[in-house]
Amino acid sequence: MSFNGKTIAVTGAFGSLGTAVVKALLEQGATVAAIDLADAPREPKALGTAHLHGGVDLADAKATQAAFDVIASQHGGLHGLVNIAGGFAWEKVQDGSTDTWDRMYQMNVRTAVAASQAALAHLPDGGRIINIGANGAVKAGAGMGAYAASKSGVMRFTEALAEELKGRGITVNALLPSIIDTPANRADMPDADFSAWVQPAQLADAIVFLLSDKASAITGALVPVTGRV
């Protein structure tokens, strides 16, 4: 697969999964716009030659549109979007706060919608949008209500947008990872079997495929990527 001449925007690009996706796309020859709420990545060298766009609040539709307009102008267009930006919260309903539900919606659903709307102003027919849902949203566990509900929203959004864009040949799909092997997750679950978790590079490989021409017949799919969890 080659992405020479194609520009792909990746949100949440400064985190563990985002960095893996940026690296995989650069290896395939893509021009990558790495977008994040953080002003700068902790490890800029890990993002290679990606064009860094820090300090972008993707929950702010106007700021998001402005960022994507700049990206498209700088690179002569946009061919794909990978929505990784998001967050997690563990909180039981009875003792929790409704503010957590609002925060999860803002971080997981609103960011994906705002970025997709902004990208669609520039995506050509045949473009690609990839979202990140969650296998834990298929059946939520205790303490997962707000997070799972927000990721379910991402999944329903994926299906709806895929239907809306079929006529343009723009595919919209989502991956449903289980636990991703990141430093933060290892710190939160130090006694877990890390070898069973999904590696960021494995998710990146699936994303690269869904962005490619070989995946042109796949749209509206919710793809489990669960490792051995």
Task: Indicate where each model-derived feature is located.
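Conserved glycine-rich cofactor-binding loop
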Residues: 14
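Conserved NAD(P)H cofactor-binding loop of Rossmann-fold oxidoreductase domains
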Residues: 84-90
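Substrate-binding pocket helix/loop in short-chain dehydrogenase/reductase
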Residues: 92-93, 97-102
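Active-site helix of classical SDR
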Residues: 116, 150
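C-terminal helical subdomain
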Residues: 167, 174, 182, 192-229
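Residue(s) in the substrate-gating loop at a strand-loop-helix junction
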Residues: 134
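Alpha-helical segment proximal to the catalytic Tyr-Lys
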Residues: 121, 163-167
